[in-house]
From Swiss-Prot:
Membrane topology: Peripheral membrane protein
Lineage: Eukaryota, Fungi, Dikarya, Ascomycota, Pezizomycotina
Official protein name in the record: Autophagy protein 5
Coiled-coil intervals, chain numbering: none
Keyword Membrane (UniProt): yes
Organism of this sequence: Emericella nidulans (strain FGSC A4 / ATCC 38163 / CBS 112.46 / NRRL 194 / M139) (Aspergillus nidulans)
Length: 334
């Protein structure tokens, strides 16, 4: 795919937003559930904690005790489930509120209308220590979590985190600031140091994580859905399968009749581009028995179904989140 096309896709990803309707937890409100909501259209690549200072100011007059908490004491929930603050809001929405189908019908459009704006609850007390790590007033915890995720992606790509470790202090902090400010040009400048344009630096593996929302465990006391995260080495290319090699040899044998002058057995294994379909078939064969067509489940990224034929490396370069990871949500079909 042309670099201009990849850049265009990345621009669209960074421009993607989700309408949010954030309400104050009734137990913390002077008026219980009658507090006015906070409405905002929020970038998919952003993180919910960045909203906490303005939410604390907005709901301050409605809090039973506004002096009892600070902005960094805030956390979010959806239908009673605490939301992991280190996940981008776009991933959280795809996990918990559904994904946009490849083709819309009147029925799915009506469903979208019910899901948007996405209704979240903000809390400034009763921090769920069992589910979430606490934030700090300086934002250091959030920054460090982001940079650690960037390091992990760098290690997966190159077998070492030397790239992110050798960034200047300004570039390291600038990467996080670019994501916070949704500043794509600044982000691209720094990311091009970590992920040089192909083919200057061949990649070892591709940073992709698969998320499988599952029903609550039978032995669990919670009604919250269980979330399984799958990560496996995904190289940019794969070896030719025996059946594919046989087809190549058969074609070579036919052409040896004089059409091309090739001799029987001349076909050699050639690396093939790793696609979303081949990767999913390899990692989750029961859910993806076909490499070409979603049959049982479908991959969702940034609210849209990902084509099975899409090369994984191109998806990483064009549609990764700010930390360099491609977070694909697996949704059952039917």
């Amino acid at each position: 795919m042309e670099k201009a096309t990849l850049n265009s896709i990345q621009k669209s990803v960074w421009e993607g937003q989700i309408p949010l309707k954030i309400v104050l937890a009734p137990s913390e409100s002077r008026t219980y559930d009658q507090t006015d909501p906070y409405l905002i259209s929020y970038p998919r690549i952003s993180y919910l904690p960045s909203l906490l200072p303005r939410l604390k100011a907005f709901f301050s007059s409605s809090l039973i005790d506004p002096t009892a908490s600070q902005p960094h004491d805030g956390w979010f929930s959806f239908e009673g489930v605490p939301l992991k603050w280190h996940y981008p809001v776009g991933l959280l929405y795809d996990l918990y509120a559904g994904a946009e189908p490849a083709t819309k019908s009147s029925e799915t459009e009506a469903l979208d209308d019910e899901q948007l704006p996405w209704r979240l609850v903000v809390h400034f007390g009763d921090w769920p220590d069992a589910e979430l790590v606490r934030l700090d007033a300086q934002g250091t915890v959030m920054h460090d979590a982001f940079i650690n995720s960037v390091k992990e992606a760098d290690f997966v790509r190159n077998g070492t985190a030397k790239g992110i470790m050798t960034l200047s202090k300004d570039d390291s902090s600038g990467l996080w600031k670019a994501v916070q400010d949704v500043d794509l040009p600044s982000f691209q400048r720094i990311m091009n140091i970590l992920l040089p344009p192909n083919p200057h630096q061949p990649l070892r593996n591709l940073p992709v994580r698969l998320f499988l929302p599952l029903p609550p465990k039978p032995d669990s006391n919670s009604d919250s859905p269980f979330l399984k995260v799958v990560q496996s080495p995904i190289p940019p290319t794969i070896s030719t399968t025996p059946s594919q090699l046989q087809r190549q040899m058969a074609q070579s044998t036919l052409s040896s009749s004089g059409v091309s002058g090739s001799s029987p057995g001349a076909a050699q294994p050639q690396p093939q581009t790793q696609t979303i379909g081949t990767a999913l078939h390899s990692i989750l064969p029961n859910l993806f028995p076909s490499r070409r067509t979603p049959v049982i489940a479908k991959p969702v990224l940034h609210g849209a179904q990902v084509p099975m034929s899409a090369p994984v490396e191109e998806v990483v370069r064009a549609a990764a989140y700010g930390d360099g990871w491609v977070y694909i949500v697996i949704r059952m079909m039917g």
